[in-house]
């Protein structure tokens, strides 16, 4: 039960910086290694991690792709997202408390291993934080798109990667570009296809009809609650992109509500968020639909 809470709390606080997908993958690997003898624990812990990562990512522009999209579109300022921290905590704590009653107090078997951080690993973490600071600074002070700040962060990594390659005594030299070549291109192409499809619907005129029904007939609050429910079924990224394409006239409070519901609504089903989809593959049948 302690491991259940530790991984959940870590997921909640790591997600705003590392994004919910990365956080879920890292902590799922921990749960799989420590709780391999208990499939029930792995299942509950993975659900807990997904809920925590999605809730934690809702109050940071870097916590989820949906929040990043809203920030880049200029609908909500960077520091305004932190107003969602209390709702995010509530969205994590209530499901976690309920799930904790189904977790036993057994102690996992511990394997003693000598684990060392690779050469330059700590400095790369620092570069990651510096990259986030660069993206925020570029956007707030110079009114440049955040992508320029993130690409500048990639240049930090390229320069430091060259330093590692020159100074590290390793059988296989460190190569940043080789690591980039192994990223999940299928996921990127999926998002690319979804965005093109939604843009096509907007060009034809269907999004205007949907916007009229949701934000005029139903009202902004009801519509944004519906956004959360749809996020669990369709995935939160295409839903948020559709909302941004509709561009309804809403106050910041309603944009924050849409951001929150899209982020945490994806936790209701395993296919509702990138973190949930990724863990279905990594958990090897222990975390399913």
Residue ranges and their predicted role:
Residues 35-40, 60-61, 159-169:
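Juxtamembrane membrane-interface segments at transmembrane alpha-helix termini
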Residues 92-171:
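Long, contiguous bundles of hydrophobic transmembrane helices that form the permeation core
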Residues 14-18, 25-56, 65, 69-85, ...:
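Membrane-interfacial helix-loop connectors
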Residues 7-11, 106-117, 218-222:
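Short juxtamembrane and helix-loop transition motifs at transmembrane-helix boundaries
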Residues 135, 139-254:
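Transmembrane helical segments that form the transport core of multi-pass membrane transport proteins
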């Amino acid at each position: 039960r302690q491991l259940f809470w530790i991984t959940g709390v870590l997921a909640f606080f790591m997600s705003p910086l590392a994004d919910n997908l990365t956080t879920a993958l890292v902590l799922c690997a921990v749960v799989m290694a420590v709780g391999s003898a208990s499939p029930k624990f792995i299942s509950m812990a993975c659900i807990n991690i997904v809920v925590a990562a999605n809730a934690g990512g809702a109050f940071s522009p870097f916590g989820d792709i949906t929040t990043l999209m809203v920030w880049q579109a200029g609908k909500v300022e960077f520091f305004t997202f932190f107003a969602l921290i209390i709702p995010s905590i509530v969205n994590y704590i209530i499901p976690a408390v309920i799930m904790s009653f189904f977790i036993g107090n057994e102690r996992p078997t511990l394997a003693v291993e000598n684990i060392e951080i690779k050469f330059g690993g700590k400095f790369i973490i620092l570069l990651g934080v510096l990259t986030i600071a660069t993206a925020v600074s570029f956007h707030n002070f110079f009114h440049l798109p955040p992508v320029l700040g993130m690409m500048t962060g990639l240049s930090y990594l390229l320069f430091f990667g060259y330093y590692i390659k020159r100074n590290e005594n390793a059988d296989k030299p460190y190569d940043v570009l080789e690591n980039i070549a192994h990223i999940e291109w299928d996921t990127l192409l999926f998002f690319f296809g979804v965005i093109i499809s939604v843009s096509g619907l907007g060009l034809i005129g269907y999004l205007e009809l949907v916007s009229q029904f949701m934000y005029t007939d139903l009202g902004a609050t009801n519509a944004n609650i519906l956004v959360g429910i749809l996020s669990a079924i369709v995935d939160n990224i295409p839903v948020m992109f559709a909302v941004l394409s509709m561009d309804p006239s809403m106050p910041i409070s309603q944009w924050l509500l849409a951001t929150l519901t899209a982020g945490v609504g994806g936790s209701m089903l395993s296919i509702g968020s990138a973190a949930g989809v990724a863990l279905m593959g990594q958990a090897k049948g222990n975390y399913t639909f």
